[in-house]
Swiss-Prot record:
Organism of provenance: Rickettsia canadensis (strain McKiel)
Protein name in the entry: UDP-N-acetylglucosamine--N-acetylmuramyl-(pentapeptide) pyrophosphoryl-undecaprenol N-acetylglucosamine transferase
Alphabetical list of PANTHER family matching this protein: GLYCOSYLTRANSFERASE (PTHR21015:SF22), UDP-N-ACETYLGLUCOSAMINE--N-ACETYLMURAMYL-(PENTAPEPTIDE) PYROPHOSPHORYL-UNDECAPRENOL N-ACETYLGLUCOSAMINE TRANSFERASE 1 (PTHR21015)
Domain of life (superkingdom): Bacteria
CDD domains assigned: GT28_MurG (cd03785)
Associated pathway: Cell wall biogenesis; peptidoglycan biosynthesis
Family that this chain belongs to: Belongs to the glycosyltransferase 28 family. MurG subfamily.
């Protein structure tokens, strides 16, 4: 049986697409090994059939501290890859994959890079010269070296099975009640706990007859304050620190307000659920902004930058969309036009390389 290594670390945005790819590869008869860092350990569940290995690499701004750590991690990765003897390694980007990718270069294991964002990350860019193929989600990806253009294959993003099972949720689900789902992705969003309730207050002042249902991710220490505001506004709500099966919330929502991580965007694209994106300004290479702007430019979503946003601006945007449902329908249609079966297309590419 041929063995394949998938490498991802850091956030759920890297982890869950890699698991979805692993599930498809297992269905095709491969033995799948998954190298992750300690931060991803919390996402592992009993029903995942891939074989996990934890190889941690702590980031440091001090090069004299980081290089010894990297050297040790690379040696561990070389030993691990030598024992597994994979036919190919697939890297999902981010600094946690560095040691495994260096080990693959040293052992001459074929490398495939997967970039879910519209802006090629620094780590993925570094390894483009060693990669056999570069799988991308956005056709006009930014920051791609000229020499690497002949290596790219547009596979689209990879979406979890429970989200794929939803199919399309496009179109209004309740004419009398408009449901907004607010979440900050796997990294959360403290900003939303203040911004969203303030925006909803302004929205209700402008349109008192509006019937809203709010589903919102919020930290426990913010929930009491948020509940008080929604109760005073006579709004039904659902608050949680984390949604274990986000497909249930997607299914009920008419509009999403979220960050613009690649995994979130690919899930919303797959099911045709329109969103207002507030990109995380501190995201590496500002990639969330480029993700959201790409969708806005193709009329498949809306991008509001955190530095320029206010409760009033957000309320106006929500009111505009609620008052003009044709805009929401068009955005849903444009999202679905971009949908791809990324888990299958990337699996096909892996088989070509093997």
């Amino acid at each position: 049986m041929k063995k394949i290594i998938l490498v991802a670390g850091g956030t759920g945005g890297h982890f869950f697409p890699a698991v979805a790819l692993g599930e498809e590869l297992i269905k095709r008869g491969y033995e799948v090994h998954f190298i992750i860092d300690l931060r991803c350990k919390k996402y592992i569940s009993q029903d995942m059939k891939v074989i996990f290995h934890i190889l941690d690499l702590k980031r440091s701004g001090n090069i004299f501290l980081f290089l010894p750590r990297l050297s040790i991690a690379v040696l561990k990765a070389i030993r691990l890859l030598y024992n597994i003897k994979p036919s190919v390694i697939v890297g999902f980007g981010g600094y946690p994959v560095i040691s495994s990718m260096f080990a693959a270069v040293f052992l001459r294991v074929p490398i495939i890079i997967h970039e879910q964002n519209s802006y090629l990350g620094k780590v993925n860019k570094f390894f483009t010269s060693f990669a056999k193929k570069i799988a991308i989600s956005y056709k006009n990806i930014k920051n791609l070296p000229e020499f690497a253009k002949n290596k790219i294959v547009v596979t689209g993003g990879i979406v979890r099975k429970n989200i794929r099972n939803l199919g399309s949720v496009a179109g209004p689900r309740n004419d009398k009640l408009f449901t907004i789902f607010i979440f900050g992705g796997s990294q959360g969003a403290k900003l939303f706990s203040e911004l969203i309730p303030a925006s909803i207050q302004i929205l209700i002042q402008k349109k008192p007859q509006l019937k809203l249902h709010i589903i919102q991710q919020a930290a426990l220490d913010d929930q009491v304050k948020i509940k008080d505001i929604y109760l005073k506004l006579n709004i039904t709500y659902e608050l949680a620190e984390f949604f274990d099966n986000i497909a249930l919330q997607y299914k009920d929502a008419d509009l999403v307000i979220s960050r613009a991580g690649a995994s979130t965007i690919e899930e919303l694209t797959y099911i045709g659920l329109p969103a207002i994106f507030i990109p995380l300004p501190s995201a590496a290479d500002n990639h969330q902004y480029y993700n959201a702007k790409w969708l806005e430019d193709t009329k498949a979503g809306w991008c509001l930058e955190q530095n320029n946003i206010s409760a009033g601006k957000l309320a106006d945007k929500i009111l505009d969309l609620i008052s003009n449902t044709k805009i929401l329908e068009d955005a849903s249609h444009n999202l679905l036009k971009r949908r791809k079966e990324g888990h299958k297309l990337l699996s096909n590419l892996i088989e070509e390389v093997i």
